From Swiss-Prot:
Zn(2+) 2 binds at residues 357, 360, 427, 434. Residues 255-510 are annotated as: Zinc finger 3. Plays a role in efficient localization of neo-synthesized capsids to nuclear replication compartments, thereby controlling cleavage and packaging of virus genomic DNA. This is Packaging protein UL32 homolog. It comes from Epstein-Barr virus (strain B95-8) (HHV-4).
Length: 525
């Protein structure tokens, strides 16, 4: 059921003026900026800051409480968070976050600084992994902005409720549909088609039922191939490796060679000083929040895993203690935790892997996680001269060399040591969503300190629609969602083969070298 939104042709009940049909376009930002003029200087908003989350911890508890699946599956049809999530995934529904922004912007004199801070949050989302931790942090940062610029708006203290805004709406707006991205009119129909596929297969992930009457081979758009359109450096051998069904229309202008893509210059001190320099301090990490939230769940517990416990590395950690103090809903499935915040909407298990990847979570939770995993991957590839299986290499390195003990941060080290060899194998070599998360995550953006002289100009450029570039092309991520649905929903063998064959080609085009997707679909979730 689609929820009601105010039409652009209806007069605003507060001002009598007609609402803008797209309040956050580049032209809309410019128009509002001219009207609003200059506003008194406020304290700079910096996303991905622990203090933002601490200041809204009641809202954290509210959002988490409504992010549990029902403990009794038979009650799911009437379980408010699940009903809300299902409705938001309907192609006939509108984006609830866009609706809220439209109402706030058009019913008040929004200052220019609001658009700058909102655009800055969107920029951070483009450099963050699609993960549970990202959805939670983004939701709290978004609420922080709303309270800062619209203090007179009623109900913001209870924003995260069914029929208002829940985890799925944060994910759809900031990570799945990315409603904030500039788009040309020529791309609208193509984006609408891909958007429909995303929603249908995300719904499939939620319900465990594949879309009816879907034939991938005939419905997924593919045209005449040409290796000349493929981005990134390629050799003659590379071109021969690409099968003949790569679509020119899908993988050209918006395509990205992820390992070599150029990143926008940003005003973050850590990056300008040369990366992980020890004298440059970074923002606090969120590892304590992960530990406190997932203690007592099945995320890292069970066969082959070390049960989560607040060990010495986390004693006295404020975020861990705050997370432990959050009341869990009686009707919720505590074993899966607040899993509706995660991209896969649940916590499923297969061969010591989980649908919530603990390594993807570490990317969004700690500034050193990506470099640590990169070093570990290099060690896996280079430490053995004979043909030892990748998984065996991981097991040997963890058992015999205590590889993870050289991680400087004790909290990150403790989190990684709770992961199984299969977690590392899946994340570093197998799963396409993990590979995309790892490639696009930029720790210098998420955790770097701000360099004030260029910060304001950078925010102004973002508010004008500049530098908001899709980190990964829409066709690739849509195909990955289709693939992920085949791991948890029952599909025919023909569809599975068609999807994995296409995905292998597209991953190679984008510079992501993984094991065959069919193998991943059979071994992990």
């Amino acid at each position: 059921m689609a929820h009601k939104v105010t039409s652009a042709n209806e007069p605003n009940p507060l001002t009598g003026k007609r609402l803008s049909s797209c309040p956050l376009t580049r032209s809309g930002v410019t128009e509002v900026a001219q009207i609003a003029g200059r506003t008194p200087k406020m304290e700079d908003f910096v996303p991905w800051t622990v203090d933002n989350l601490k200041s809204q911890f009641e809202a954290v508890g509210l959002l988490m409480a409504h992010s549990y699946l029902p403990a009794n599956a038979e009650e799911g049809i009437a379980y408010p968070p699940l009903v809300h999530t299902y409705e938001s995934l309907s192609p006939a529904s509108t984006c609830r976050v866009c609706d809220l922004l439209d109402t706030l912007v058009n019913h008040s004199d929004a200052p220019v600084a609001f658009f700058e801070d909102y655009a800055l949050l969107c920029y951070y989302c483009l450099n963050a992994p699609r993960a549970w931790i990202s959805s939670l942090i983004t939701g709290m940062d978004f609420l922080h902005i709303l309270i800062k610029y619209f203090p007179m708006a009623g109900g913001l203290d209870s924003l995260f409720m069914p029929s208002r805004i829940l985890a799925i709406d944060i994910q759809l707006h900031f990570y799945i549909c990315r409603c904030f991205l500039p788009v040309s009119s020529s791309d609208m129909i193509r984006n609408a088609n891909l958007g429909y596929y995303k929603l249908e297969f995300l719904k499939s992930i939620l319900t465990g039922q594949s879309p009816a009457n879907f034939c991938f081979k005939s419905m997924w758009p593919r045209t005449t191939p040409t290796f000349l359109t493929l981005p990134g450096p390629r050799t003659c051998k590379d071109s021969q490796d690409v099968p003949g069904d790569v679509g020119r229309g899908l993988y050209t202008a918006l395509c990205c060679h992820l390992p070599t893509r150029n990143r926008v210059q940003h005003p973050f001190l850590r990056a300008e000083k040369g990366g992980l320099s020890p004298e440059i301090t970074t923002k606090a990490d969120y590892c304590g929040l992960l530990l406190g939230t997932w203690q007592g769940t099945d995320l890292l517990g069970g066969p082959g895993h070390h049960a989560i416990g607040l060990n010495a590395e986390y004693s006295g950690d404020e975020l861990a203690e705050l997370a432990l103090a959050i009341t869990r809903p009686e009707a919720g499935d505590h074993s899966q935790g607040p899993c509706l915040l995660a991209p896969m909407f649940g916590l499923r298990h297969k061969n010591a892997s989980r649908t919530i990847c603990p390594l993807c979570e570490s990317l969004g939770a700690h500034p050193d996680a990506k470099d640590t995993l990169d070093r570990f991957k290099s060690l896996i590839l280079d430490s053995f001269g004979n043909n030892i299986k990748i998984l065996d290499r991981i097991v040997f390195l963890i058992k015999t060399q205590n590889t993870l003990l050289d991680v400087p941060c004790p909290r990150l080290r403790a989190w990684l040591q709770m992961c199984t060899p299969q977690d590392f194998h899946k994340h570093l070599f197998c799963d396409p969503l993990c590979a995309i998360n790892h490639s696009i995550t930029n720790p210098s953006v998420l955790f770097g300190q701000i360099y004030p002289p260029s910060f304001q100009a950078f925010k102004a450029a973002l508010a004008a629609g500049q530098n908001l570039e899709q980190g990964v092309c829409d066709s690739l991520i849509t195909l990955v969602y289709i693939f992920k649905s085949t791991q948890v929903a029952r599909v025919g063998k023909t569809i599975l083969v068609d999807v994995t064959k296409e995905l292998d080609v597209v991953l190679r085009i984008h510079g992501l070298d993984l094991v065959q997707s069919y193998q991943t679909s059979q071994v992990y979730v």
